[in-house]
Design a protein with these regions (language model features):
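A polyampholytic, Gly/Pro-enriched intrinsically disordered region
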Residues: 188-202
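A generic local structural motif
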Residues: 28-30, 82-83, 133, 201-203
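Metal-dependent polysaccharide deacetylase catalytic core of the NodB/CE4 family, i.e.
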Residues: 40-41, 62-190, 208-221
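Non-transmembrane alpha-helical segments in soluble domains
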Residues: 58, 130, 134, 158, ...
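N-terminal pre-catalytic segment of deacetylase/amide-hydrolase enzymes
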Residues: 1-44, 49-65, 83, 193-194, ...
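Catalytic grooves of carbohydrate-active enzymes
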Residues: 199-251
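Loop/helix-junction capping segments adjacent to catalytic residues or to phosphate/diphosphate-binding pockets
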Residues: 51-52, 79-80, 155, 223-230
Length: 253
């Protein structure tokens, strides 16, 4: 009897430690915002094909003595031209995580609760992503957060991540920062100046500002987008610092 009670207490303690913090904001089983009581912004960069922002982004982060989180696909990790940049990010203390091996679309845009991949296909792609990260010293233990490709997922994807020992995270909606990849010939094109103004307007008009925000940007974009938002990163960080914010890796405090 005593052993049973002890076991129950241990399991309850472990569950409490592993449960998401109540201050986190969840959507479809994924964390989409950190602690809303802290003036902390989590800069998140994703990459699949392009890395043209690497020099600018890393230099700006260094200038601000800030750390960020970088979620790359397996294809990105395997690209020889990106190896040096990835190692530099790791060396400078930034978070490296997964973003799908082949940048799969998990669910239809028009019917999010459906699936375009089976559980087996998803887990196989996930393992391949982490296999590509291993040469850089990145494992599930060192990098337990996963950001879904296309930033599009549902409850099933979140649950499969959890079953694989990972926590799904995604950008905080509201600012449109994730549109920094769009190109002029597309109908959804968002100029960098408009994105910049939306971020600051959101901060000023909401009670919790950008507290706990996972602010997603892209590590590089298509050559057709010459108006690169990462060229505004220094100004954005400077302004947010003036407003009392600090920057940390994903969900670090």
């Amino acid at each position: 009897m005593k052993l049973t009670v002890i076991l129950v207490l241990v399991l309850a303690w472990f569950h409490a430690l592993s449960a998401p913090r109540t201050s986190h904001v969840l959507d479809r089983g994924g964390i989409v915002r950190g602690d809303t009581t802290r003036r902390t912004v989590h800069l998140v960069f994703t990459g699949h094909e392009f890395a043209d922002g690497a020099d600018t982004i890393t230099a700006v982060l260094r200038r601000h003595h800030a750390h960020a989180s970088f979620f790359f696909t397996g294809d990105f990790y395997r690209t020889p031209a990106f190896t040096g940049r990835i190692r530099a990010l790791r060396r400078e203390g930034h978070y490296l995580g997964g973003h799908s091996d082949k940048h799969l679309l998990y669910a239809p845009w028009e019917q999010r609760d459906s699936l375009l991949v089976s559980k087996r296909e998803f887990l196989s792609d996930l393992e391949d992503n982490y296999r590509a990260m291993k040469p850089f010293g990145v494992t599930k233990r060192t990098s337990p957060y996963f950001l879904p490709s296309y930033e599009w997922y549902n409850d099933s994807i979140s649950a499969w991540c959890a079953g694989a020992g990972l926590t799904l995270v995604n950008f905080t909606p509201g600012t449109g920062s994730n549109a920094d990849y769009t190109i002029p010939e597309e109908g959804n094109y968002a100029p960098s100046d408009a994105i910049y103004k939306r971020i600051l307007a959101y901060e000023a008009s909401h009670a919790n500002g950008l507290n706990g925000f996972l602010l997603l940007l892209h590590f590089g974009t298509h050559p057709h987008r010459t108006d690169k938002f990462y060229l505004r990163l220094d100004a954005l960080m400077t302004e947010l610092e003036h407003r009392g914010y600090s920057f940390t890796r994903v969900l670090d405090y």
